[in-house]
Amino acid sequence: MSKKRRKLNKDFEKKIYSSKKNVELVLAKIYDIDDEDIQKEYISAFNRVVYLFDELKENYELHGFSDNSKELLNNYENAFNLFESEFEI
């Protein structure tokens, strides 16, 4: 049985790459915080964003671009924006 080919989307790949860089930047800023309690609070709050990014990336790698891709990207972006609005980093 032949394997189904993933549908790719260059613009979507650029958004994933940009999202990855944003996650890495925020994590680096969080790890630079000296106060352990504040750092733990930020990490705890940012974990949801990281989880949603990982879900987005894995879904694209496994299934390619699909109807679900836009929803996953939207969920990630909303969580990232919410984190930025609630935490000054």
Residue ranges and their predicted role:
Residues 65-89:
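Amphipathic alpha-helical binding modules
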Residues 23, 27, 34, 50-57, ...:
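A structural signal for well-ordered alpha-helices, especially hydrophobic packing surfaces
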Residues 3-37:
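N-terminal acidic leader/helix
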Residues 12-15, 19, 42-45, 72, ...:
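Amphipathic alpha-helix face/heptad-repeat signature
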Residues 1-10, 82-89:
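Short acidic DE-rich linear segments
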Residues 37-73:
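Acidic, low-complexity, intrinsically disordered interaction modules
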